Every structure is written in structure tokens, then in C-alpha cells.
From Swiss-Prot:
Assigned protein family: Belongs to the KptA/TPT1 family.
Domain of life: Archaea
UniProt-listed GO biological process terms: tRNA splicing, via endonucleolytic cleavage and ligation
Known EC number: 2.7.1.-
InterPro entries in the cross-refs: Ptrans_KptA/Tpt1, RNA_2'-PTrans_C, RNA_2'-PTrans_KptA, RNA_2'-PTrans_N
The entry's keywords: NAD, Transferase
Gene assigned in the entry: kptA
SUPFAM superfamilies from the UniProt entry: ADP-ribosylation (SSF56399)
Gene Ontology MF term list: NAD+ poly-ADP-ribosyltransferase activity; tRNA 2'-phosphotransferase activity
Protein name per its UniProtKB record: Probable RNA 2'-phosphotransferase
Amino acid sequence: MAEELPELALCCDGTVVEGRSNCRCKARAVLPGGMRVRLSKTLAGILRHHPGRYGVRLTREGWARVSEVVEGLRKAGWSWVEEWHIVGVALHDPKGRYELRNGEIRARYGHSIPVNVEPLPGEPPPILYHGTTEEALPLIMERGIMRGRRLKVHLTSSLEDAVSTGRRHGNLVAVLLVDVECLRRRGLKVERMSKTVYTVDWVPPECIAEVRRESLGRSL
């Protein structure tokens, strides 16, 4: 299922909100939901994987100038993009993918290029979820959850988000329930990177407490 998000509106007072009806004054401009999703995916690609394609420079902590991102997007054919679009996408991202500060932006997680993003404070819940497909299960149960092309394995505290992730990779969704205490006993540090996303270097097979088939709503 494709991600769906409401429109973003730039209000006359300079604020960016979801839905023009939420402006306290007249909306000056609107970013439709479909375009918002496309822009967010492109932004994630720039900040996580290939900033150089767009002429964007990242610091060691993953920060980029918003103005530089806008310039890179415009040169790549996104001629309509303005800074408020980038700020709005970041501020209202439902998964907390992005962080803003003083005219800069970065992705909080998901990188395949080496950056140093400090974790957020807060302890993980006892169980975290990882969405995948049934086709991938045999290898996962043998080797554990590997990081693949990313710097870290990504887990979530949201069952709904795990199901959504699994659906992006196939029709037969499997959700893995990961025992956080098991990870700790094996010296694996779990770090909180957004309001629902946590990262770890690896999940050993023995730390997978349960596997659920989402389509049937029961354990395998």
C-alpha cells in the first residue's frame, strides 16, 4: 500500500501546517499530499544515501544546509521547490525521519553512508518489531536480522509501521518480535533514533522471540 499523507499548507503568518483549514490565517501556498510523499522520498535519498548526486554536502553528523538541498533539487528538475516545502516535510514527518536546526536538516536514521547521528534519550520497550516477508524468513532465522546496505538494523516500537515496512517488500508479510533484553545480554546496544525507530548492529536469531504472519494475525 502506497504511503498517503495530507497536504501541507504555508499560512500567511509563515507557519507550515497539515491541511489549509488548520491555518490561523489564509493559506499562501499548498503542497498536495502526493507531491509531499514524492518529495519526502527524494529528500530521504539525498540525506541518507546519495547527497553528491544533488550537489549536497553533509557534515560528519549528517547535517546539510536546507538552501543547498533546495538548490540541488531545482537543478535536478524540481523547479518549484522552496525552503518551506523542505521544512514542512521535515516538521510533519509522521515517523520523525528528519531533524532541523538553524537552517540545516538531517535524516535521523536510515543511512547507508557513514555519519554520526547521536541517539535520543529514552529506553526502548521490552519488545520491538521488524517487518519483512515470509520469503526472507529462512535466512533470517538462520543468521538473524542483518543490517544489509544500511549502517544499522532498524527496529520499531510500532506494530503498524513494521507491517507497513513488510508490505513494501512483498505481499506475504512477517513481523518479527525482538526481545530487547536478549540483545542487551549479548552486548548489543539498542539506540532510540526517533519517536518510534530504534537501531542496533545486529539481531541474533535467538533474540527473535516470535514471528507473526500479518495476513492471518497469528504466530507462525
